């Protein structure tokens, strides 16, 4: 059975109206941050979105049975255990208990990295949550699936494997519209498209991307650990198993590795948020313990119920930001196309993810912290936003230091003078990003 979809897309301000149809298959739609990818999905699927849109849909013909994989993987999770999360959709279909158990066993086989099904889903890494959400979305055999940047936490190998998995799931004539902020994802599509503020067009080729023109000075950051061991409770295997690292004179350190293999856990050990079972971590800046700030891969966790304005106020009150730098910080936000007046008093949940992430990075960049640990800082950023982030790093890495946790190997290799590959347990010196170094 084929479930083709069609609609008219009208860009009112630009008097541009387009008739679009998608046959069965995987269709990849690229758009910069802020181009309206989430609004595209919400409007086409009939969900309410209070934000003003540059376009409207008419003459919509889509299957009734559809699923959405959301950009923020936490937004899709409803249950308190992994097993109940996996079973939830099937339970809603009132499947016979024996059939449900058989289906649950089959679904679990798609997620072999999970050993304790009583864990809370939020204990997974961002990439692992995305894998879970893909499995739950496809578990009900939908005719149409929207993916809103839902593979952006995955490293290259995992992404290829899951695209193959998706293709296997839609081989009977289903439609998948995958909207992404990463233009390299276009290579996976049966058709390729680009969404902008004024147009929606088909692409024959993938746009050429310029490499980052980035350099920073040599640094004085040192980090060392030997035979580091850490396991989470009820886990059969250690997340960190006798890791070793010795880095000196760094300015920016990149941590790369497969999804769920301990990058975020290592950052928590570095900051002392958790303690190792064996070994210790020494981190020094000019032979002193540095002041460290961490931005979670889920940036809304940093704010909780607070606003960005209250965060800046708290930083000043607690002597973590010089009051004389507040206006400079706000001006920097405007420089990078972030309207402080609009977002400063909004809830974190009401601010677009890419905007919130960039805003927090810029605010921390003006704080008194010496080292910023940024967990997946490029997630959800389009190419232009990544270039802006690169420029900001170049501006602050005269006095600041970075530890970048990322699956984006290109971004890491173009911005880090040391790269720690946790899978291979290898540290690589990368002099190409250093000023006056060959």
Regions found by a protein language model. Name each.
Residues 30-32, 256-258:
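The feature captures the beta-strand-to-loop junction immediately N-terminal to the Walker
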Residues 134, 360-361:
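Hydrophobic anchor residue at the start of the ABC signature
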Residues 72-74, 78-94, 298, 304-328:
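Q-loop/switch helix immediately C-terminal to the Walker
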Residues 99-116, 324-344:
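Conserved ABC ATPase "signature" region
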Residues 120-124, 128, 347-351:
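Conserved ABC ATPase signature
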Residues 45, 271:
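Helix-to-loop junction immediately C-terminal to a conserved catalytic motif
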Residues 120, 149-151, 155, 347, ...:
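Walker B catalytic motif
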Residues 138, 364-365:
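ABC ATPase C-loop
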């Amino acid at each position: 059975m084929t479930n083709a979809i069609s609609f008219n897309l009208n860009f009112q301000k630009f008097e541009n109206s387009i008739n679009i149809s998608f046959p069965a298959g995987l269709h990849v739609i690229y758009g910069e941050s802020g181009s309206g990818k989430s609004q595209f999905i919400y409007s086409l699927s009939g969900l309410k979105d209070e934000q003003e849109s540059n376009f409207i849909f008419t003459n919509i013909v889509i299957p009734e049975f559809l699923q959405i994989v959301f950009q923020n993987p936490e937004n899709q999770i409803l249950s308190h255990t992994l097993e109940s999360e996996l079973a939830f959709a099937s339970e809603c279909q009132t499947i016979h208990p024996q059939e449900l158990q058989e289906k649950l066993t089959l679904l679990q086989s798609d997620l072999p990295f999970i050993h304790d099904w009583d864990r809370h889903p939020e204990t997974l890494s961002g990439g692992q949550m995305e894998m879970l959400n893909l499995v739950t979305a496809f578990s009900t055999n939908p005719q149409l699936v929207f993916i809103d940047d839902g593979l952006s936490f995955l490293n290259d190998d995992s992404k290829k494997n899951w695209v193959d998995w998706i293709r296997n799931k839609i081989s009977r004539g289903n439609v998948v519209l995958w909207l992404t902020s990463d233009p390299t994802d276009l290579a996976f599509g049966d058709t390729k498209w680009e969404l902008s503020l004024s147009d929606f067009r088909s692409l024959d080729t993938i746009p050429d991307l310029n490499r980052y023109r980035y350099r920073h000075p040599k640094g004085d950051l040192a980090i060392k650990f030997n035979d580091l061991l850490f396991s989470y409770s009820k886990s059969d295997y250690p997340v960190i198993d006798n890791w070793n690292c010795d880095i000196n004179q760094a300015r920016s350190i990149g941590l790369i590795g497969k999804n769920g293999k301990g990058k975020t856990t290592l950052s928590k050990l570095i900051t002392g948020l958790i303690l190792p079972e064996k070994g210790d971590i020494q981190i020094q800046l000019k032979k002193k313990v540095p002041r460290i700030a961490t931005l979670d891969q889920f940036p809304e966790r940093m704010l909780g119920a607070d606003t960005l304005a209250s965060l800046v106020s708290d930083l000043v009150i607690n002597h973590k930001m010089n009051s004389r730098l507040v206006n400079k910080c706000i001006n920097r936000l405007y420089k990078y196309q972030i309207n402080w007046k609009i977002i400063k008093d909004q809830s974190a949940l009401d601010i677009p993810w890419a905007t919130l992430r960039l805003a927090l990075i810029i605010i921390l960049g003006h704080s008194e912290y010496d080292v910023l640990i940024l967990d997946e800082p490029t997630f959800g950023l389009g190419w232009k936003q990544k270039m802006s982030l690169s420029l900001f790093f170049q501006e602050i890495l005269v006095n600041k230091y970075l530890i970048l946790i990322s699956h984006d190997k290109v971004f890491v290799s173009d911005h880090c003078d040391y790269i720690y590959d946790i899978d291979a347990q290898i540290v690589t010196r990368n002099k190409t990003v250093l000023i006056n170094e060959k």
